[in-house]
Design a protein with these regions (language model features):
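Structured secondary-structure scaffolds
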Residues: 1-25
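Catalytic adenosine-cofactor/nucleotide-binding cores of aminoacyl-tRNA synthetases and other
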Residues: 14, 24-181
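C-terminal accessory/binding modules appended to enzymatic or scaffolding proteins
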Residues: 182-201
Length: 201
């Protein structure tokens, strides 16, 4: 069947013997079986579909970068020396089943956000804009051509106050939206000089 490895949660151990018998009966070559600890919630409960942000699309919707999520999941129950950040090539090079711990890992949203913040702050503005543009087109409103350059020029400081692409989108509304709402306190801070700067922008 050209299957070399079956890697799954340790709750499937009980199925393994029966499945091995099927392979042997069919005279197929047995794959390597690996049963790894389950991922739990921060409360120590088994992760389920009913939990908030349990699918990849859930994380995409809140602006989690795929590389950041991959890096976080890679380090969830696995380690390589004291290294924390892995690009895709390094992930493939260093990952091995022997490095996986025996205890269940906890899916911690605060750590996911921290990892995502690291990626946002360290990615170059061109790639970050492409990610933001894709995110906005998929989940928000598309960045129009006349706003694109202003967004690009602003990313160097927008990314320093962001943990997600959602944060960047929200903090760049003064560029993306044609209408900016000010409350009474905001208006008190806007003098003639401020109005001139805003209008020129």
């Amino acid at each position: 069947m050209n299957i070399t490895h079956i890697i799954r949660g340790d709750d499937h151990k009980i199925n393994t013997f029966k499945q091995m018998q099927i392979y042997l009966a069919m005279k197929w070559e047995l794959p390597s079986f690996a049963h790894i600890p389950l991922i739990h919630t921060v409360d120590g409960k088994k992760l389920s579909k009913r939990d908030k942000a349990s699918t990849l699309d859930d994380y995409s919707k809140i602006g989690i970068i795929s590389d950041a999520l991959r890096n976080y999941l890679l380090r969830l129950g696995w380690s390589f020396k004291d290294k924390e950040i892995f690009n895709l090539d390094e992930s493939i090079k260093y990952f091995n089943l022997e490095g996986i711990g025996k205890s269940p890992s906890k899916l911690d949203m605060s750590r996911i956000l921290s990892m995502n913040e690291h990626y946002i702050k360290n990615i170059d503005e061109i790639n970050l804009y492409n990610l933001l543009n894709e995110y906005c087109a998929g989940y928000k409103i598309e960045i129009t051509a006349d706003k694109a350059q202003k967004i690009k020029n602003s990313l160097s400081f927008l990314k320093n106050k962001a943990k997600t692409l959602e944060d960047i989108y929200r903090n760049s509304q003064y560029i993306i939206s044609d209408k900016v709402n000010f409350n009474d306190d905001d208006l008190k801070l806007i003098d003639k000089t401020s109005k001139k700067i805003i209008s020129e922008f």
